[in-house]
Amino acid sequence: NIHNETREYNFSIRQTLLDEARDLKYVVKNYHNRAYNNPELLIFHLQNSLHKLAAKIQLEGGARIEGVALIKSEQLLGTKLDSITNIKKGIIFTKEKGGKVGEVLVSLETYNELQNYLSNNPKFKINRQAYYEDIKQSALISNENSEASHGLRWNFAKRRMFEYAKANYSYDDCLQQVSYEMKHNRASITKHYLV
């Protein structure tokens, strides 16, 4: 900050106020599970191959639409061992909502598919509206409720929580780490994806 002062912030009052508002029926509690029952089948039924690739990145890495709508070759950072699953993954560097930046880890198969595409094209770019429409039609064919591409982030959060738990992280640490991977700050945000 401009005054060179150390400041600490505690936003926990927000959750307390929200909980109390819900108890008093001032806020509708209409959160529902937006994860797809079979996200792989949903992706299989997508008509556009670029949409399939974008959806795989969202499902495997938890990226938002901003992270997959436009990807350039310089965003591909190679591979590394995922310390949680001990599986080698491809690294895509993304900038998403609020300017938050970071790594998105995807399977080597998905990473190589993206890398191959970018070796023949200047950029990976999808039209968001066409992507949403493709997902909507695929959900219909797959007998799923359409939750747009954000539903794939829900699937990511649930799977990643399980992976952290298998790696002997505490519940609170699982929440926090998944929150960071999804480019959130507060651990409590992850709870919304676990409904």
Question: Where are these predicted regions, by residue range?
Answer:
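Non-catalytic DNA-binding core/recognition domains of DNA-processing enzymes
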Residues: N1-E5, V106
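A short mid-domain helix/strand-loop element embedded in enzyme catalytic domains
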Residues: R14-E40, L46-N48
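Basic, Lys/Arg- and aromatic-enriched nucleic-acid-binding interface segment
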Residues: R34-I65, L175
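A short, glycine-centered helix-capping/turn motif at helix boundaries
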Residues: N48, I57-I71, E163-Y164, M182-H184
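Conserved tyrosine-mediated DNA breakage-rejoining catalytic core shared by Y-recombinases
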Residues: L70-E113
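Active-site/catalytic core of tyrosine-dependent DNA strand-transfer enzymes
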Residues: L105-F162
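C-terminal catalytic core of tyrosine-transesterase DNA break-rejoin enzymes
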Residues: R153-S188
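Major-groove recognition helix of helix-turn-helix-like DNA-binding domains
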Residues: S188-V195
